[in-house]
Amino acid sequence: STTNTADPRKTKYYPKFDWPRVENPKIRYGKDGLTLTREAEARSEREIRKAFRTYRHDIAAILIEPIQSEGGDNHFRPEFLRLLRRIADEEEALLIFDEVQTGVGLTGKMWAFQHMGMTPDLIAFGKKMQVCGVFAASRIDEVKDNVFVEPSRIGSTWGGNLTDMVRARRYLEIMAEEDLVGNAARVGKHLLERLHTLAEKFPRLISNVRGLGLMCALDLPSPESR
């Protein structure tokens, strides 16, 4: 599993890859939030660069959710994601975004990375498409006979099928016909404004309102108050 959460159901019966994992430099809030976030980003960068030095020939990619969903609706500064882009280029590694939850219009754009001013090399999708898969940017073509060029490499027992593809295409057509991505942006803007209003009304209860499109979140003081 690539999970980084403490839920034992994710790893009790399945292997957990022994990959290098680094500090999560999620956006911090409050008056010192920007300073704390930048400090966390610097620590994360040091850990990433150390991992590349230690395992130089064993690391193929940097993998991240552009917004950590199950991890606590953690957002990252676009500057940090652009830093990951630079490091991946310097180290000749791929930058992979897990957009299984953030993708397919939820954030008000088709893909969350479109908010960030950069493009990953590989994007994983699922959930709302009712089928899981990946698509790639042009950098993948640096690998001769990659999986997108050599059809037989993707025709595995657990691979996709025509029914999935037809159904997924119809979903995309409906999304375009009904402007569902634009609607997520408009309704999400209203939702975020109303959440900020609630936070102003109940400052001791609601804090750290954040969101892109309909992917909005807030913090409560404790599980009991929730």
Residue ranges and their predicted role:
Residues 1-226:
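Conserved N-terminal phosphate-binding loop of PLP-dependent enzymes in the Aspartate aminotransferase
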